[in-house]
Amino acid sequence: MAPKKAPAAAAEKKVKKAPTTEKKNKKKRSETFAIYIFKVLKQVHPDVGISKKAMNIMNSFINDSFERIALESSKLVRFNKRRTLSSREVQTAVKLLLPGELARHAISEGTKAVTKFSSSTN
């Protein structure tokens, strides 16, 4: 007995999958300041460690501080009817947000970092 052949119409109706253009779900990397916090900790107290919970708290604190400085700086730019954010607005925002001596130290360290960066790029 000969094998049965499928009807021609049924053979043409093969379902083809459309090529998928979906990207694979990659694990999103979150940017943290953990390595920098750890470096500063070791400069100040070489024999002290930090727990994961404390590191998360410090990271949140730094993110919050940067966000507040950026928000205040952008308000100053809009208030002065300018289009460019300069170091002057950032310094003023730091003076407004941080108390006395802490603001002075932050501004001097920031100025030092900008000067170092400017000299290295030239």
From Swiss-Prot:
A Pfam entry, by short name: Histone
List the protein's name. Histone H2B.1
> Which lineage ranks, top first, belong to the organism behind this chain?
Eukaryota, Sar, Alveolata, Ciliophora, Intramacronucleata
- UniProt lists compositionally biased (Low complexity) regions at 1-10
Q: How does it get modified after it is made?
A: Acetylation occurs almost exclusively in the MAC.
Region labeled Disordered — which residues?
A: 1-28
The UniProt similarity line reads:
Belongs to the histone H2B family.
* Xref: InterPro entries: Histone-fold, Histone_H2A/H2B/H3, Histone_H2B, HISTONE_H2B_site
User: Its encoding gene is what?
Assistant: HTB1
Functional description taken from the UniProt entry:
Core component of nucleosome. Nucleosomes wrap and compact DNA into chromatin, limiting DNA accessibility to the cellular machineries which require DNA as a template. Histones thereby play a central role in transcription regulation, DNA repair, DNA replication and chromosomal stability. DNA accessibility is regulated via a complex set of post-translational modifications of histones, also called histone code, and nucleosome remodeling.
Chain positions found as N6-acetyllysine = K5, K42
Task: Find the cross-link Glycyl lysine isopeptide (Lys-Gly) (interchain with G-Cter in ubiquitin).
Answer: K116
Database matches in SMART domains: H2B
